[in-house]
Amino acid sequence: GRQRQMCIRDRWGTSLIDKFKSDMERNPEKWEYLGDRSESRDKQYMAAGGISHRYFFNSDASLKTTVAATYSQLDGGASMFNHALESTPYMDLESRHTNLILTSTFNRKFSNRFTNKTGFTYTAMFYDMNLAIPLYSSAASDVYKRQAPYEAQLLETVSKGDGNTSLISAYNSSSVGLSDRWTLNAGIYGQYLTLNNKWSVEPRAGLKWQATPKATFALAYGIYSRMEKMDVYFVKTKSTGNQSVNKNLNFTKAQHIMLSFGYKISDRMNLKIEPYVQFLHDVPVMADSSYSVLNRSDFYVEDALVNKGRGRNIGIDITLERFLEKGLYYMISGSLFDSRYRGGDGVWYNTKFNRNYVINGLIGKEWMLGRNKQNILSINLKLTLQGGDRYSPIDMEA
């Protein structure tokens, strides 16, 4: 007879508002740093929501489709004060982004040893953004530059965009059981950005070996790429006027190689060890400068960039986890790593994320309370030990 078909629907949504204000020191005699005589304000609004639909053709085939929307808004500004407490603006930022997302995935189980997943994602991106900062220009340079202390300098627009574009991606991946102990996962992923007609094709594969009932080994390799934040594509420089100098930037690309060892110590405890290496190329950098988008920390980018940067991450992750039993659980994880990048000047630097080590400990205890043991009292503790932030020493002689 006919197999029963089933549909599952799911809805979700979330939002947040974040506001920040920093006031200046009103007594000029107490000014020691540039920040003492500046004021700033930032307001961020974010919202996301969607609906998912899963249709089961039969027990071996299903189609999941999701429609979602996201919205983000950032309004920021900052002013600098002189000793007469007269203010001069040195940043004005307005940014609004709306994404409409359609994604669909078809899963098919051909046999106990062969499954396939095929899907696509279409993202329509609507943007309206404007960044203005005080600039001066040098006759010997094609690039606008900011110059402290920003007083008596008019705001100039360095990034402005209003329109829409699309990011389209598709993939196909399969899982094949080569034997009772060996499993191969392989696939291909591709994406296309209509803003500048840039595209990428990325193969990915992984091999898993069940060495013993308690021990597994795995090796994975893949190529991954990403577009930049939208404001990067709409930076302008002195000689180009209103023309965007970064609009033809290519994707940043990375090759990932990872080994994995997993060991089941007991029914409630697992150990996992994962060494990895990541090589990045086509990273946007500023020519003849140490600047790279890998180190981006500001709300904005103000320079012309080229895809000539590189990056390298190497490290090992170790995790020991005890699942909840008799009300007790804990997890200890540690990472040792080195993260570096090569700027537009050809020199290798530490990234701002290169803390070299991070150790996390999490432990929790639960008690069942009440007449029918339906209430839960829990105590949880998390500890983190990590390396410090990277910084550039001040050149006192300069």
Protein language model features and the residues they cover:
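Transmembrane beta-barrel strands of outer-membrane/channel proteins
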Residues: 9-15, 65-71, 118-124, 186-190, ...
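Flexible loop and strand-edge segments within Gram-negative outer membrane beta-barrel domains
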Residues: 9-56, 60-63, 69-97
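Short loop/turn motifs that connect adjacent beta-strands in outer-membrane beta-barrel proteins
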Residues: 56-62, 109-115, 181, 214, ...
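Gram-negative outer-membrane beta-barrel transporters
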Residues: 277-279, 300-391
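Surface-exposed extracellular loop regions of Gram-negative outer-membrane beta-barrel proteins
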Residues: 18, 22-26, 62-91, 162-194, 214-257, ...
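Outer membrane beta-barrel strand-and-loop segments of large Gram-negative receptors
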Residues: 95, 99-103, 159-163, 246, ...
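Short, small-residue-biased leader/transition segments that mark boundaries at the very start
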Residues: 1-8, 133-144
